[in-house]
Amino acid sequence: MPEPLTLRMVLIVIVGVFLASFVDGIAGGGGIISVPTYFLAGLPAHLALGTNKLSSCIGTAVSAGRFVKNGYVDWKLGIPSILLALLGSHWGTLLQLSLDEKVLKWLLLIVLPIVAVVVLRQRQLPEQRREMDERRRAAVVWLASFVVGGYDGFYGPGTGTFLLLIFCTLAGLDLRTASGNVKLVNLASNLGSVFTSLMNGKVFLLLGLIGAAASVAGHYIGSGLAIKDGSRIVRPVVLLVLALLAVKVVPELFV
């Protein structure tokens, strides 16, 4: 059982989750802030991850809704992506519940340099959709939705960033459509993970709902900036998120 809810826990979660969701609403990757927030609030590892998914799920729904409203979603790619992300996330969460946390940190250490190379080699995230075989585009998007959805259930930080990079650079989607589809996939993977965590008693419901209120505000403001300003805002935030990911994970592996 979690500790009784305290004012300190509430304040830490409100501030940390708002900042995380603001970043996530622009470019994804807010989990690198929100997951440590729940640790700082005093929750053990699996409970922190499950509670984070609850607040992220509600906030991401608001962000996704703004992209849908503005027409920045490719539904032919999006509907299968949602189903695959749900499935991948469920399996990823089951695996996460069975493993030691340090395994997850080593995974990030392996993935991070690969992502950094992709970002730094790309001069800017494309504003225009690239011509390519539509079957290949769909295969890339659907495979990424399943695999990264599994990673999101397994641990999570960086999920939105990884998806955005793949959808833009490998699947050739324009930045805004990629961002809209990323939000749908991220919402689906959050739903799959939070359901699995709830079934295993790994969600602090009250604290997660408090975090959800902060998440809604952060996602709404952040996604509005992404829609208005495109890659001028998203690219620097992607690079910042990757830097934060490295600063957090690498030292913890050697403690």
What does each model-identified segment do?
Residues V147-P157, S193-G201, G208, L245-V255:
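Hydrophobic alpha-helical transmembrane segments in multi-pass integral membrane proteins
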Residues L43-N52, K76-P80, G172-K183:
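Membrane-interface alpha-helices at helix entry/exit sites of multi-pass transporters
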Residues V10, K53, L108-L112, A116, ...:
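Residues within membrane-spanning alpha-helices of integral membrane proteins
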Residues M1-P44, R129-S179:
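Selected transmembrane alpha-helices and immediately adjacent juxtamembrane segments
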Residues A61-Y72, L107-D133, G224, L244-V255:
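Transmembrane helix exit motif
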Residues L40, L47, T93, L97, ...:
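Transmembrane helix-loop junction
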Residues G50-V103, I110, N190-L240:
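Selective hydrophobic functional segments
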